[in-house]
Amino acid sequence: MQIQQPPPEVARVGLRGIKMLATADGEFHTLERGLMDAAQKHILGTQFELDDLESITPRELADGIPQPLREQISNGCLITALIDGEASSAERLLLDEYAEAFGIKSPELTNLHRLVDNHLLLFRLDVARRSFLGQRVKKFVAERGLRGISHLIQGLRKAENQEVADRYRGLGDCAEGTLGRSYLDFTRKNGFSVPGEIGGPPEPVVFHDCLHVLAGYETSPLEETQIASFQAGLMKKQPMFGMFFMLAQFQLGIQVTPIAGAEFMQVDPDLMLKALVRGTQVNRDLTSDWDPWDDFEKPVIELRRAYNILPR
């Protein structure tokens, strides 16, 4: 995901538009305030008093935001609409007006419509398909064909695949401090199974646990919101669906993945944006074209340096 720091005068215009969206349902929620403060802290580098921001029309907003920044402001509005745990009809209407003024048509906005209209099956399917999870599964099946599909089905049926399980258990032979050894230690410490074991995740999800290790996030719901935001930050293809995935799973209570149950109102806006920006600084999209097996024998500290994974 590319995030730009606009000039202060442009940032103020954008914040006015976001505040209009936040208050469209008649309430300026604490989480919406927190999100706007976090955006100023981690992205904009400004300190505007939110209560002093004037109202603005969609046309005025579009006139004040140059083309390269319109998608970024639109994404900020989408996150704002969801951060309080629900999307309202009033927010949807204003988002439609913003999109028309910006000249933007996006699948993200289509999915916000699905949320408001309670078309949750379509929402789940599309977010899962476009998020890092869907991209990973698609790549896994494309590379392994019918055998890959068979492995996925076997895992969902809670059946053991000893060949796959033994391969991952063998990572215990890697040197201490390597990604392979650290990944296996991470799974065992948290009571997880490895792929191939009963209850283990499908192989396309292994990268996620490896990113937990590389980025230093734990597994509580609050920590999961941060690793998911971090992942969205380093995604090059449809990164906003990484944020949609996280917000649905941990803020809206809508289960998108069959691997873990949904949580409600777990997001801290400041920590979320801090993790998102941290992800944008990584120099490779580790959610799509990275195979952890290429790096399992390398030291974690070396990989953090190679991929520019900065300290928390």
Where do the model's predicted regions map?
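Generic alpha-helix signal with a bias toward terminal, lower-confidence helices
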Residues: 33-34, 40, 52, 77, ...
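Generic structural signal for short, solvent-exposed loop/turn connectors between secondary structure elements
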Residues: 41-64, 188-204, 208, 312
